[in-house]
Design a protein with these regions (language model features):
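N-terminal hydrophobic/helix-forming segments and targeting peptides
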Residues: 1-21, 27, 124, 128, ...
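Histidine-centered active-site/metal-ligand motif
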Residues: 24-26, 104, 108-111, 167, ...
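Hydrophobic beta-strand positions in extracellular immunoglobulin-like domains
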Residues: 64, 195-197, 264
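Non-cysteine beta-strand/loop elements that form the S-adenosyl-L-methionine
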Residues: 77-79, 88, 191-193, 351-357
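Metal-dependent amide/peptide-bond hydrolase catalytic core
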Residues: 216-400
Length: 400
């Protein structure tokens, strides 16, 4: 089966590359993926694969039912996100974005193309497995409330046993894949704080309450409690980073209010709840010390992404079977977030990373940058690997 899938992924390579380049050239922002959805539907229809449309907006869910009479018979969901980012692409490649200010800078074009290729392979091989495989083409990963939460609310993953997803990763060389068991990616919530004081003349402190001083003290206190650090030991306590502090005063004018915006991240849901309480209480108490008040609003983002230990180990072993075992790596936790986390909170899930960088080809830009690109050789790897994992899981092939 491994060789059959590899050969099919090789024969589909040009198709998958063409799809990826088309999507890259015509990117669409979150929940606006109308033409992207059309590309997906047209390809699935051309392969004779059944699908549902307009799920959670422009989402598409395709299904292939295995016809083999074999033990196992699991239902597996494979997920790809499909939205782009509000970034102006700076590239000279022939497939660079023609939609001004919109770019596939996170690799969702590649995710979609690889999942379409996997759907084609799995459909061709439906006589070799039992069970059911769903292909979830999800809108809106980059924007709250996250397309994953809406797909779940729409029942798109009803009766699913496992969910598997892959994400391009420029920190790994093309040819490698990375796995991590347990808490893998952080939760991500948006922190909004408004400090209200009494504005006035800079030279008359008795006539004003300085909201700017209160805001600065809040940032200082919270930063000591939840420091920015690249070490996992400190990350386990949570990370809070403020990226915006706006005080609309001037040289001799103290503003009546200051707004602050930041991101809050942790791997632990209990810690997530306690951080929210601490941020709110400390902000109110500190503001009061300066004769000010605080309005605190923390918008729930994505929960922490938890890879199921047993499923992730199975997927890692299957990857070692499909690829050169030396290319299958253990990778550390990441403070970045992905709404695949919603699936991981609802079902046993595995979210792994696929390497896409190639320094020798000059492909090494990071995600969410204007020059991001991938070594397209990774498309064949991702297409074949996802197919092999899904069919093996359906047939209950456990390499333990």
């Amino acid at each position: 089966m491994k060789q059959i899938i590899f050969d099919k992924s090789l024969s589909l390579f040009d198709e998958v590359v063409a799809i990826r380049r088309k999507l890259h050239k015509y990117p669409e922002l979150s929940f606006c993926e109308k033409e992207t959805s059309s590309v997906i539907k047209d390809y699935l229809a051309s392969k004779g694969i059944a699908f549902e449309t307009d799920v959670a907006g422009y989402g598409v869910v395709a299904t292939v039912v295995g016809t083999a009479v074999l033990p196992g018979g699991a239902t597996i969901a494979l997920r790809a996100d499909m939205d782009a980012l509000p970034i102006k692409e700076e590239s000279s490649c022939e497939y660079r974005s023609v939609n001004e200010g919109v770019m596939h800078a996170c690799g969702h074009d590649a995710h979609t193309a690889m999942l379409l290729g996997a759907a084609s392979i799995i459909h061709d091989l439906r006589g070799s497995f039992s069970g059911k495989i769903k292909f979830v083409f999800q809108p809106g990963e980059e924007k709250l409330p996250g397309g994953a939460s809406l797909m779940l609310a729409n029942g798109a993953l009803k009766d699913v046993d496992f969910v598997v997803g892959q994400h391009v990763f420029p920190d790994l060389q093309c040819g490698c894949v990375g796995f991590h068991q347990g808490p893998f990616m952080a939760s991500c919530d948006e922190v909004n704080i408004i400090i209200r004081g009494r504005g006035g003349h800079a030279a008359k402190p008795s006539e004003r309450s300085n909201a700017l001083l209160a805001a600065a003290d809040i940032v200082s206190r919270l930063s000591k409690m939840f420091p920015e650090s690249d070490t996992v030991a400190l990350r386990s306590d949570g990370l809070l980073c403020f990226g915006s502090l706006i005080a609309d005063g001037t040289y001799n004018v103290v503003p009546p209010q200051v707004s602050m915006k930041g991101t809050m991240r942790t791997f632990n849901e209990n810690k997530r709840a306690s951080m929210k309480s601490i941020i709110s209480a400390l902000s109110h108490d500190t503001a009061a010390l300066f004769g000010c008040s605080a309005d605190v609003f923390i918008e729930n983002g994505y929960p922490s992404l938890i890879n199921d230990n047993a499923l992730t180990e199975k997927c890692r072993l299957l990857a070692s079977e499909y690829l050169d075992p030396s290319k299958v790596l253990d990778i550390p936790q990441m403070m970045t977030a992905d709404d695949f986390a919603f699936y991981s909170q609802a079902f046993p899930s595995c979210f792994y990373r696929i390497g896409v960088s190639n320094v020798s080809k000059g492909i090494d830009s990071k995600q969410h940058t204007s020059t991001f690109d991938i070594d397209e050789d990774a498309l064949q790897i991702g297409t074949g690997l996802m197919s092999f994992i899904a069919i093996s899981l359906c047939n209950n092939i456990i390499l333990l």
